[in-house]
């Protein structure tokens, strides 16, 4: 297992990127948050990671410094699905508010040709407090951290 930090900054950083990271196990990757914009694509490339390999993505909460990079990931995934250049499926996990916002934003900024792949090949999975699933062959448990700023989830991965 390898942890790749893509960013460590808060919402208003200008000299680094917002907090997000990737957990890798051989050729399988689990991306957590996307930072605040399309710089996520640069951060992945600079870390030697291909955005196409991010097949499991978890978004912790709705703040723009965690969410907007995911819209760019969705755009890249969906555009390339539409062009026949992205094989297989991908999954984005988040609590109900995160998934709703991502779907609404995508519906406003992406084309119908791209949107047709949502829930067909790009799965938008709502997770609940205490819910378990398998990611990269590992048991993952999602939990509400009870943040007072915004509903926010974390996770525990059994190694």
Q: In which residue ranges do the predicted regions lie?
A:
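Binuclear metal-dependent hydrolase catalytic cores
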Residues: 1-159
